[in-house]
């Protein structure tokens, strides 16, 4: 029996900016952090509860053996518009208004809004593109 997914994972450029965006602005609790390695080379893995028993996770890699910088915006690396590959969260109208206001107060404006007839979407870029 299919039960959905446990987590999806993406790369991040700045774990603190990522935490701030998802925990402080969107309200997703940081539920688990794994750190492997040492001061020279390490991997940090952050898990955020997205509200249905699933998590969204981010890897931060630094040190020898890892690139000093890496693209985290999946779509543009494939020559596509930045909004093509994305994650969409469910929210009722009141929650959407609240999130839009919170993000706007933090200086984060939607990339675009789309009425798909069967759902309405607000597209934002997180700190990772």
Language-model features: where?
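Residues that flank catalytic or metal-binding motifs in active/ligand-binding sites
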Residues: 4, 44, 52-54, 83-85, ...
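Short acidic (Asp/Glu) patches
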Residues: 41-42, 69-73, 107
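Helix-adjacent hinge/juxtasegments
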Residues: 63-95, 99
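Vicinal oxygen chelate
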Residues: 100-129
